[in-house]
Every structure is written in C-alpha cells, then in structure tokens.
C-alpha cells in the first residue's frame, strides 16, 4: 500500500515538472512556435533529493536537455537547465521562470 502511494506521488510530481519544463521551453524561445514538442526520457533523484529530468525537443534526440529541480527551489523546476547547442540557440538570453510565466499568462486572461 505504501509503495503504491509513493509511486503515485512520484508520478504526480513528475507530471507537474514536465508541465513546468514544457512551459519554460516553449515560452522562452527567441521565435514563437520553434519548439513544437517536448519529450521526456528520464527522471532521477539524486542522493540529496534533487530531481534530474532529461528529455529532448521536436522529435530530435540530439536536441536534448537536462533540467534540475533542487531543494533550494522547493524541488520545483525554476529554469536550471543544461541544453544542447541547438536548444540553447532557440532559447532567449534572459528567460522567465515557470512561476513568472504563469503570472504573465494569468494577467493576459484577466484582460
């Protein structure tokens, strides 16, 4: 029973981080709609509890990234990422965190 609950919590957490990473990548591109899809390949938990999430964009496994969610950010992805050169070239120099993006989107909805 406890294992099932822990697995369910991990699945919910993983899904939430996938949404945050996808939002971050798609919102912070230099040109709109250059990232069509985001795929995730693994979620690892480091000994100190930090999450390491790997994936790639646009169905090209060479356009990969590694995203981090650390205890400093309450284990929520905030933009800490290592990208391949191609992914890095698509992303703006000054990016917004997923939380900042959500605030911007909420403001647009209010209008």
Task: Give the predicted meaning of each segment.
Residues 1-48:
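N-terminal export/targeting and maturation segments
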């Amino acid at each position: 029973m406890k294992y099932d609950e822990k697995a369910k919590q991990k699945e919910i957490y993983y899904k939430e981080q996938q949404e945050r990473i996808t939002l971050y990548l798609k919102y912070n591109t230099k040109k709109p709609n250059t990232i069509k899809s985001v795929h995730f390949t693994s979620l690892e938990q480091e000994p100190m509890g930090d999450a390491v999430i790997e994936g790639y964009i646009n169905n090209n496994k060479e356009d990969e990234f590694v995203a981090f969610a650390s205890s400093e950010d309450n284990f929520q992805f905030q933009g800490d990422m290592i990208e391949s050169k191609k992914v890095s070239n698509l992303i703006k120099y000054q990016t917004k965190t997923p939380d900042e993006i959500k605030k911007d989107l909420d403001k647009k909805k209010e209008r």
